[in-house]
From Swiss-Prot:
Residues 98-166 form the POTRA domain. It is a single-pass type II membrane protein. Its main location: membrane. Essential cell division protein. The lineage of its organism: Bacteria, Pseudomonadati, Acidobacteriota, Terriglobia, Terriglobales. Belongs to the FtsQ/DivIB family. FtsQ subfamily. Residues 1-66 are cytoplasmic. It comes from Koribacter versatilis (strain Ellin345). This is Cell division protein FtsQ. Residues 88-347 are periplasmic. HAMAP family: FtsQ_subfam (MF_00911).
Length: 347
């Protein structure tokens, strides 16, 4: 037999043998340490791992969630019902505007019913929900006599129009025509039929093509004149047959009585005081002039009689009324008709 060339000593062999014998024992001891010793009274208890838990919803919060869900469900149901009703209303024949008889009109005293229903001519045989109420309202308010209007649907197949008409305050001479005019300068044709009998002065000095803003400014002058003349309660404005507002700096009024018509220049202020001066001295002036056509009261210290007449027909004013004696040719003439006004009668 071949021998190992490396010699082994007795101690080395015994050491190797003991090492092999102890290896399984050491492994067994290691695994045995992993097993819990249930019977050991000194066994340390295992540490519990903390578990984080969120707060549970309270009973009130749960009730709120339920209520919110119920409300949401009710809203969904209502929305569905509304959509169904809307679809039915938009397509059902029951909501059709059959004729102009289905249009109710109220508040029209000076306008005919047909003037208003003509605005809805294109809506006949249409569904009332397809009628643009706001647009029709604007169209109705564009009618001269209408100041404001309301348009509403009346289920199932009617429309109601309620109008508020303008209130005329005077007649306006526009070219060869005489129309009614309100406080804002809006011109209106004579009503087709009315039980009201108007007694207004005629306002001259307006033109058909001038903008509404210009007429509105002229009407403010007229209203201020009437307000001052009637402030004392004597209603002096009723004695006016014509008011010329063509010149804002010289408002001219025609006063007509049994002895004739007189054109009075009132200027742009102190209308009441100047008119009172005219009424107080009218008889005196007429006693001095056989034909008193006009009186100029624009100047504080003088009164000019017949300033619109020819100079040859003028005479000096009474010294008691006008200390500074003036003749019409000397005073600044005002633009007015040269003869007495008989055409501007109260209508």
């Amino acid at each position: 037999m071949a021998r190992n060339g490396n010699p082994q000593f007795p101690d080395e062999r015994s050491t190797a043998t003991r090492a092999k014998a102890t290896e399984p024992e050491e492994l067994d001891d290691r695994f045995s340490d992993l097993e819990p010793e249930e019977d050991s009274p000194f066994l340390r208890s295992q540490k519990r791992v903390p578990v984080r838990r969120g707060p549970l919803p309270s009973k009130k919060a749960a009730n709120r969630v339920k209520i919110a869900l119920i409300v949401l469900g009710v809203l969904v149901v209502i929305g569905g019902v509304w959509m169904a009703l809307s679809a039915y209303g938009e397509h059902s024949w029951r909501f059709r505007l059959e004729s102009s008889d289905s249009i109710e009109v109220g508040g029209n005293e000076h306008m005919s019913r047909g003037e208003i229903t003509r605005v809805f001519g294109g809506d006949i045989s249409r569904n009332i929900f397809a009628v643009p109420l706001d647009e029709r309202k604007k169209q109705v308010e564009e009618l001269p006599w209408v100041e404001s209007a309301t348009v509403m649907r009346i289920l199932p197949d009617r429309i109601r129009v309620q109008v508020t008409e303008r209130k005329p305050v005077a007649f306006a001479q526009i070219g060869s025509r005489v129309q009614l005019i309100d406080a804002h300068g809006v011109l209106m044709e004579m009503p087709f039929s009315t039980t009201n009998k108007y007694s207004f002065p005629v306002i001259s000095g307006m033109h058909e093509n001038e903008p509404l803003s210009t007429r509105s400014a002229r009407m403010k002058i007229y209203q201020e004149l009437v307000k001052e003349l009637d402030a004392s309660g004597e209603h002096n404005s009723k004695s006016l047959s014509e008011v010329d507002v063509s010149d804002p700096d010289d408002v001219k009024v025609t006063v007509e009585d049994a002895d004739g018509a007189v054109l009075v220049h009132l200027g742009s202020q102190n209308f009441a005081d100047r008119f009172h001066l005219y009424v107080t001295h009218l008889k005196e002036w007429r006693s001095q002039y056989q034909h008193l056509d006009s009186v100029d009261l624009r100047y504080d210290r003088q009164v000019i009689l017949n300033p619109d007449s020819h100079p040859s027909a003028a005479k000096p004013t009474a010294p008691a009324v006008a200390p500074a004696v003036e003749k019409p040719a000397v005073a600044k003439p005002a633009v007015a008709k040269p003869t007495a006004h008989t055409s501007g009668r109260r209508h």
